[in-house]
Every structure is written in structure tokens, then in C-alpha cells.
Curated annotation (Swiss-Prot):
The enzyme's E.C. designation: 2.7.4.6
Protein name per its UniProtKB record: Nucleoside diphosphate kinase 1
Triggers of expression: By salicylic acid, benzo (1,2,3) thiadiazole-7-carbothioc acid S-methyl ester, jasmonic acid, and abscisic acid.
A Gene Ontology molecular function term of the record: ATP binding
Active site residues per record: H115 (pros-phosphohistidine intermediate)
Record's subunit section: Homohexamer.
InterPro entries in the cross-refs: NDK-like_dom (IPR034907), NDK-like_dom_sf (IPR036850), Nucleoside_diP_kinase (IPR001564), Nucleoside_diP_kinase_AS (IPR023005)
Reactions accelerated catalytically: a 2'-deoxyribonucleoside 5'-diphosphate + ATP = a 2'-deoxyribonucleoside 5'-triphosphate + ADP; a ribonucleoside 5'-diphosphate + ATP = a ribonucleoside 5'-triphosphate + ADP
UniProt KW keywords: ATP-binding, Kinase, Magnesium, Metal-binding, Nucleotide metabolism, Nucleotide-binding, Phosphoprotein, Transferase
SUPFAM superfamilies assigned to the protein according to its UniProt record, in alphabetical order: Nucleoside diphosphate kinase, NDK (SSF54919)
Names of required cofactors: Mg(2+)
Presence of keyword Phosphoprotein: yes
The organism of origin for this protein: Oryza sativa subsp. japonica
């Protein structure tokens, strides 16, 4: 099954949004396969956001990610990357659809609460970076109540 990397950013952690965000993914029927509560080192943040290193906002983004703890997670399920992006909402909170995480909780693009993989391939890269030790193997007993096969 498809996997996606999801990170609750420092503002989401500080604002006490961890439980609600996890609940949204669980209620959709996705499986939590890995989770870490951690502080991010500068070099690690730079590596994670390397594709944005030429952007003018890159230094501020790195400072933001290292400013406090994050919750790094791997979610698994059918079409979890695309569906996860819909649950999260547009990068710019004012463009996010009502009911999405960013529409509900974010005001500024620089404090937009959450990161989610934007493609299956990027998800694989992010998961390998953040979870080099691997993931928990398990399947919920609810699987047949969520998926047809």
C-alpha cells in the first residue's frame, strides 16, 4: 500500500494540534506506521528541504523547522499521498478549502502547521530520510471495514 510522510511543524506542536491532526488521518482509515517526536538539527532540515535551497525563503524555513519539536509520521493507505494533501489543504492557508487542516488552523504560509509528501516518489525519499531504521509492521483489525479487498 502507498505511504506518505507527514510532519506536524513546530507551530502545530506548540498550539496543541497533534491529536486533532492524527485523528483526521485515522478517521479517514489510514494506518500510522511510524511516528517520532523530535527536535530537528539544522543540517537535517537543510537536507529535507534541499529542493528549496535556492528560494529566498529557505533560510527562514530552516529556522522555523528547527525552532521547536516536530512530529514526524508515516501514514499508509490507498491513495494516501493525494488524499493526505486534500486533508492538509493548500500551502497558502487563504487558498485552502474549508475543513482542511490549513484552512482550519493556519493564517500565514510561513506558519502553515503541517508538511505532507507531494508525490509517491518524494514520500519514499522523505520516509527513507526520516525513518532510516524502518517502520512498524502491523495491520489494523479494521482493514476489512475500510477496504474492499
Amino acid at each position: 500500500m502507498e505511504q506518505s510522510f507527514i510532519m506536524i511543524k513546530p507551530d502545530g506542536v506548540q498550539r496543541g494540534l497533534i491529536g486533532d491532526i492524527i485523528s483526521r488521518f485515522e478517521k479517514k482509515g489510514f494506518y500510522l506506521r511510524g511516528m517520532k517526536f523530535m527536535n530537528v538539527e539544522r543540517s537535517f532540515a537543510q537536507q529535507h528541504y534541499a529542493d528549496l535551497s535556492d528560494k529566498p525563503f529557505f533560510p527562514g524555513l530552516v529556522e522555523y523547522i528547527i525552532s521547536g519539536p516536530v512530529v514526524a509520521m508515516v501514514w499508509e493507505g490507498k491513495d494516501v499521498v493525494a488524499t493526505g494533501r486534500r486533508i492538509i489543504g493548500a500551502t497558502r492557508p487563504w487558498e485552502a478549502a474549508p475543513g482542511t487542516i490549513r484552512a482550519d488552523y493556519a493564517v500565514e504560509v510561513g506558519r502553515n502547521v503541517i508538511h505532507g509528501s507531494d508525490s509517491v516518489d518524494n514520500g519514499k525519499k522523505e520516509i527513507a530520510l526520516w525513518f532510516p531504521e524502518g517502520l512498524a509492521e502491523w495491520r489494523s483489525n479494521l482493514h476489512p471495514w475500510i477496504y474492499e479487498s
